Structure formats: structure tokens, C-alpha cells
Curated annotation (Swiss-Prot):
GO cellular component: actin cortical patch; actin cytoskeleton; Arp2/3 protein complex
Function comment: Functions as actin-binding component of the Arp2/3 complex which is involved in regulation of actin polymerization and together with an activating nucleation-promoting factor (NPF) mediates the formation of branched actin networks. Seems to contact the mother actin filament.
Protein species of origin: Saccharomyces cerevisiae (strain ATCC 204508 / S288c) (Baker's yeast)
Similarity annotation: Belongs to the ARPC4 family.
Location in or out of the cell: Cytoplasm, Cytoskeleton, Actin patch
Protein name listed in UniProt: Actin-related protein 2/3 complex subunit 4
Gene Ontology molecular function terms on file: actin filament binding; molecular adaptor activity
Domain of life: Eukaryota
Pfam families: ARPC4
Keywords noted in UniProt: Actin-binding, Cytoplasm, Cytoskeleton
Lineage: Eukaryota, Fungi, Dikarya, Ascomycota, Saccharomycotina
Coiled-coil regions, chain positions: none
InterPro entries (UniProt xref): ARPC2/4, ARPC4
């Protein structure tokens, strides 16, 4: 893990731990319904808490939107060049197609972000909050590492193919 990634992930960890103090809150509009208030458009202001924006640089950001009974966390994965943009897009599409396996993963991310998670009070009741935070932090580390490894492999493969192609022209 790079030295600049460690403080970024630490800030995300502490912010998530603070935001995941969720409680059961019934809907104010529909009886016997409990819906994530952060997902409801035009919800009352007292149910939404102050959003937190944590940025490592202009290309890597986290938006944590807490409410009284849910937290939506959106990640912008690093996309320094066109290759990384393509890799991140393919990688996140692959994960979003398997959203059922990740209980907290949203199928469609917030516009401007690569991937989003939705954690409700039911998730914090059935799973340990510390383990949820650990999963998200480990997920962020793994995505960063995977994108870097795939990019290195892709560049090595392109170099090999270019050398093989150019060897045809050497006499």
C-alpha cells in the first residue's frame, strides 16, 4: 500500500465508523414501511445528516451520505489516464452485475462516481459494524491494487506484442 493511500483510507475508516450509528426509523409517509431515507428524493432535512467528502486527489474521492437509518457511500476510483478509465468501467460493471452477492452494493452508482454502497440499519443489525467498515476499506485497497496490476499486465502485453510485430521488419 502506498504511503499516500494509508491516510486516505484511515480518514475513510473513521468517517464510516462515525456515520454507521444507524437506528430503525419508520417512514413518515407510509405506515409500516422502513426505507433508506438517503435514497428517498425530497425527504425532510432533519432525516439527512451532513454529507462527508473525502478526497485523496481530484481522481480519487469518497462521498459518504449519512441519514438517520442508512448510509450511502460512493467511490470514485482512480482514473489517471484513458486505460485506467476503461479498466475501472469494465471492473465496476462486472461487480454491479453481481450485486446480489454483495449485500450492500448498489447496482447503479451515483452519477460521477465509479461504485456505490448502501448500508441500512438492517445491515448493521445483522452484521458487525466493524466488519462492514473493514470490508469496505479492504475493498478499496483491493480495487486500487487490481487496477494497478491489470494496467501493468496490459502494458507488458502491449510491449511484447509491439516487439513481436517489429521483429518482423528487422532483417
Amino acid at each position: 500500500m502506498s504511503q499516500s493511500l494509508r491516510p486516505y483510507l484511515t480518514a475513510v475508516r473513521y468517517s464510516l465508523e462515525a456515520a454507521l450509528t444507524l437506528s430503525n426509523f419508520s417512514s413518515q409517509e407510509v405506515e409500516r414501511h422502513n426505507r433508506p431515507e438517503v435514497e428517498v428524493p425530497n425527504t425532510s432535512a432533519e432525516l439527512l445528516l451532513q454529507p462527508m467528502h473525502i478526497s485523496r486527489n481530484e481522481n480519487e474521492q469518497v462521498l459518504i451520505e449519512p441519514s438517520v437509518n442508512s448510509v450511502r457511500m460512493s467511490l470514485m476510483v482512480k482514473q489517471a489516464d484513458e486505460i485506467e478509465q476503461i479498466l475501472v468501467h469494465k471492473f465496476t460493471r462486472f461487480l454491479e452485475q453481481r450485486a446480489e452477492a454483495f449485500y450492500i452494493l448498489r447496482r447503479v452508482p451515483i452519477p460521477g462516481y465509479s461504485i456505490s454502497f448502501l448500508i441500512t440499519n438492517k445491515h448493521t443489525e445483522s452484521m458487525k459494524t466493524g466488519k462492514l467498515v473493514d470490508f469496505i476499506i479492504e475493498f478499496m485497497e483491493d480495487v486500487d491494487k487490481e487496477i494497478s496490476e491489470i494496467k501493468l499486465f496490459l502494458n507488458a502485453r502491449a510491449r511484447f506484442v509491439a516487439e513481436a510485430y517489429l521483429d518482423e521488419f528487422v532483417y
